[in-house]
Amino acid sequence: MITRNSIILRRLYPTAIIRTLATDATESTVVKTKRRRTIFTDELNKGPSFDDFVSGKAKDMLEDPLETARKDPNAKLPSWLKVPIPKGKSFHNVKKDVRELKLATVCEEAKCPNIGECWGGKKSEATATIMLLGDTCTRGCRFCSVKTNRKPAAPDPMEPENTAEAISRWGLGYVVLTTVDRDDLVDGGARHLAETVQKIKQKAPQILVEVLGGDFRGDLSMVEILANSGLDVYAHNLETVEALTPHIRDRRATYRQSLAVLERAKQTNSSLITKTSLMLGFGETDDQVKQTLRDLREIGCDVVTFGQYMRPTKRHMKVVEYIKPEKFDYWRDTALDMGFLYVASGPLVRSSYKAGEAFIENVLKKRKHNVGETPRLAQEIKPSIY
């Protein structure tokens, strides 16, 4: 606001002098305060000085974070989660064919710790898990390391043929076909999966085929298409207990929807083996796991596997607890007592881990010898899974 005094000052004194007087008056009234100390400042003060760097003493004062983590026992994985580096002729042959035929495998994309054991086994025991419909998922679950995108590339029309060719070439006894979720496709990729199964059976009818499929956004007619494709095992993973599902899986995947998928598969083709997998270590309780097993038995699910959740990267959710091997034994015995046809349970067990062994040594032997009490059979043939 312009006052009479300010007009008089402007007439008597030049503008520069007025600005100087105003600045001096302001500075005289400002009380200078010390800058607040910060954690960063404190850390700098604790560290080496410029003279320490010049004299070479700094290297003795600084800690290498990688070396510190290596020496810290709490930063290490438990001994039961360590695996040898993948190697061997069979392993490299499978890897070579995967590259040549431009196939994607969940073994590599999901950084599975069992890749060396599954790919490196004998032909009759080896298991490969081929990931169809590309390597990019339309969903983003907090535990999964597979790439995500709302609009992945269109499916390769030659993928069913190339997959069947590769599998027949390897001479595997069992193959697992899995897939990324393709919510961008009208049928969710169900017909693409069914075609792949049919081509495999045409080229190598002796191979047992398991398909680990998605929920097709709850469209159960797509489940029926896949269940009637000629596959031997229909798998769909619950991943975790009901209470934790919204926090761990993509919001489009629900616990009840997954149960409905497994139930419809069995209703469509009663000869199918239905299978699911649970990861432990998210903070689930024993009561929650037991309720999940009861829910699975109510819909007639035949096979369940338990494995330890292992954080793929720092961008994914943290591990709440590393479950001990003894606890996995407990869950195996508990599930068998509830009537599951077969249970694989161990820290390194994954949905498709030793799938061929599980199916061949349990289901086929049961059918061949007409064994009545399945849980007892499964207990007698407990494989070494860790």
UniProtKB/Swiss-Prot annotation:
NCBIfam families (UniProt xref): lipA, PRK05481.1, PRK12928.1
Pfam families: LIAS_N (PF16881), Radical_SAM (PF04055)
Cofactor: [4Fe-4S] cluster
This protein's name: Lipoyl synthase, mitochondrial
Naturally occurring in which organism (per UniProt): Candida dubliniensis (strain CD36 / ATCC MYA-646 / CBS 7987 / NCPF 3949 / NRRL Y-17841)
Cofactor binding mode and count: Binds 2 [4Fe-4S] clusters per subunit. One cluster is coordinated with 3 cysteines and an exchangeable S-adenosyl-L-methionine.
Annotated pathway: Protein modification; protein lipoylation via endogenous pathway; protein N(6)-(lipoyl)lysine from octanoyl-[acyl-carrier-protein]: step 2/2
Residue numbers binding [4Fe-4S] cluster 2: C137, C141, C144
CC annotations in GO: mitochondrion
